[in-house]
């Protein structure tokens, strides 16, 4: 595996490749990330991964400097997965001057759910993804469904900017007890780790109610949040949305069988977890 930080060197190595598959990450890799590499290999060759902790997507109350950096361990994992190039730019490589031009997702996608609680987050994400796409110039890029809103926003950005990159969605990789794998899980205490699967269980309960014909969305969301609160969680949201555009479904949408997704974010102790489940 080649490790490259220079954009021009990266382009030289990839020139002439017909179907490069790309997986962007911020490092601190776990089995969920590695499953994205395997899916990428099914859709393209060579596979390029990136590791870059993107300052632009960190808010004023989110500690950029404390984000886990495990570069050498990440390198070993990517080598075992047969990744061809690891693109690992420094901030100076990727942002040689202040990034004055930013991508701004539409408000109805970027300022709801995660965007409401993390202002500017999706602008930071889409700006760095667009820049990474420009560097790698992939035919396909793989994003996990765990970050469902991010997936939708990146997919819409790629479509509206007519980027020659197909966005592939990867199913959420879960532990045996249902907890979605996340770099944040390392912050959970043993007791919190035992409790953490309750978030996915809550999503399943909501989904089962919808499938059984319960159409009062507000009541389902309210009850699910109250149940988590009683267990010691601090939920930011549990919200039922349309898969197509992440807008709240109308009664007509519900009656007509619109494809839905229930999304959640909640704090357990000091650790904020997110998850979702398609219905």
Swiss-Prot record:
The keyword Protein biosynthesis does not apply. This is Pantothenate synthetase. Its EC number is 6.3.2.1. InterPro entries: Pantoate_ligase, Pantoate_ligase_C, Rossmann-like_a/b/a_fold. GO terms for molecular function: ATP binding; pantoate-beta-alanine ligase activity. It comes from Janthinobacterium sp. (strain Marseille) (Minibacterium massiliensis). (R)-pantoate binds at residues 57, 150. ATP binds at residues 26-33, 144-147, 181-184. Belongs to the pantothenate synthetase family. The reaction proceeds by a bi uni uni bi ping pong mechanism.
């Amino acid at each position: 595996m080649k490790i490259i930080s220079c954009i021009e060197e990266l382009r030289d190595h990839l020139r002439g490749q017909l179907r490069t598959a790309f997986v962007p990450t911020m490092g601190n890799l776990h089995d969920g990330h590695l499953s994205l590499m395997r899916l990428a290999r099914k859709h393209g060759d060579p596979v390029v991964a990136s590791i870059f902790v993107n300052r632009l997507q960190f808010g004023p109350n989110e500690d950029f400097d404390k984000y886990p950096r495990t570069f050498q361990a990440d390198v070993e994992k990517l080598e075992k997965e047969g990744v061809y190039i690891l693109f690992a730019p420094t901030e100076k490589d990727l942002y040689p001057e202040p990034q004055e031009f930013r991508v701004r997702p539409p408000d109805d996608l970027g300022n709801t759910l995660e965007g409401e609680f993390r202002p500017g987050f999706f602008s930071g994400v889409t700006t760095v993804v667009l820049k990474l796409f420009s560097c790698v110039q992939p035919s396909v890029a793989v994003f996990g469904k765990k970050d469902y809103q991010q997936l939708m926003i990146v997919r819409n950005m790629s479509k509206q900017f007519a980027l020659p990159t197909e966005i592939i969605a990867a199913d959420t990789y879960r532990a045996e007890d249902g907890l979605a794998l996340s770099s944040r899980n390392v912050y959970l205490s043993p007791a919190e780790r035992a409790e953490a699967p309750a978030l996915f269980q809550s999503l399943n309960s909501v989904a089962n109610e919808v499938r059984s014909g319960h159409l009062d969305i507000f009541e389902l969301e309210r009850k699910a949040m109250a149940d988590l609160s009683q267990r010691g969680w601090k939920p930011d949201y549990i919200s039922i949305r349309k898969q197509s555009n992440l807008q709240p479904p109308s009664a007509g949408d519900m009656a007509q069988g619109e494809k839905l997704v229930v999304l959640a974010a909640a704090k357990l102790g000091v650790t904020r977890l997110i998850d979702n489940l398609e219905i």
